[in-house]
């Protein structure tokens, strides 16, 4: 999956099993202040269980590292709570449920906690407004080219994610299918394909 970060096939971090040896090596270097543990298990997570499993492992690791003489003072807990996107029945944990789980699994350690709760709290807070610069009719396809591009909103091109697209001032007339695209010379510069909307013009 494109947004997982905590599996063996992902390029990030070090494995749980190898972490004690990495910390021991860092401590030997002398100039490094081994202050904490940072972890991130992925994005768009809508189930509390993966967090709880990961945080319990972090509690075990922190306890072990402290027993080995490392001055562990903080845990940075990554893994994003998901947004309920169209076409899914996923409901992310409520922030209160998440907070209670953090306290239950890690509260006894008495460390500083840095939380990376993901896009759930802000994912639906913003909009991208663009202007139609050209409507291109091809055989069987109509492209609405706008002045925003994949560099402004990468998620549809990168992940194939769905974002709602609506005209600011809808025109009268029957809905039809439009491909909403950006002007970049890149085939993946697409915001939505076959979107049903009323007439669109420059």
Language model features by range: what are they?
Residues 8-16, 103, 138-143:
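Acidic, His- and aromatic-enriched active-site or binding-groove loops in soluble protein domains
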């Amino acid at each position: 999956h494109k947004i997982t970060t905590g599996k063996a096939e992902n390029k990030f971090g070090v494995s749980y099993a190898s972490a004690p040896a990495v910390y021991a090596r860092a401590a030997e270097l002398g100039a490094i202040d081994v202050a904490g543990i940072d972890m991130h298990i992925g994005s768009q997570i809508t189930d509390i269980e993966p967090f709880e499993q990961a945080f319990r492992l972090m509690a075990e690791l922190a306890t072990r590292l402290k027993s080995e003489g490392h001055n562990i003072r903080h845990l940075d807990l990554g893994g994003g709570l998901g947004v309920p996107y169209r076409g899914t029945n996923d409901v992310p944990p409520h922030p209160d449920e998440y907070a209670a789980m953090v306290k239950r699994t890690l509260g006894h350690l008495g460390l500083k906690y840095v939380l990376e709760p993901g896009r759930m709290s802000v994912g639906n807070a913003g909009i991208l407004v663009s202007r139609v610069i050209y409507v291109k009719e091809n055989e069987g396809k109509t492209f609405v080219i706008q002045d925003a591009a994949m560099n402004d909103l990468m998620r549809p091109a990168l992940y194939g994610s769905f974002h709602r697209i609506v005209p600011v001032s809808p025109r009268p007339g029957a809905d039809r299918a439009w491909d909403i695209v950006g002007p970049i010379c890149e085939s993946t510069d697409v915001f939505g394909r076959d979107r049903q909307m009323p007439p669109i013009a420059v």
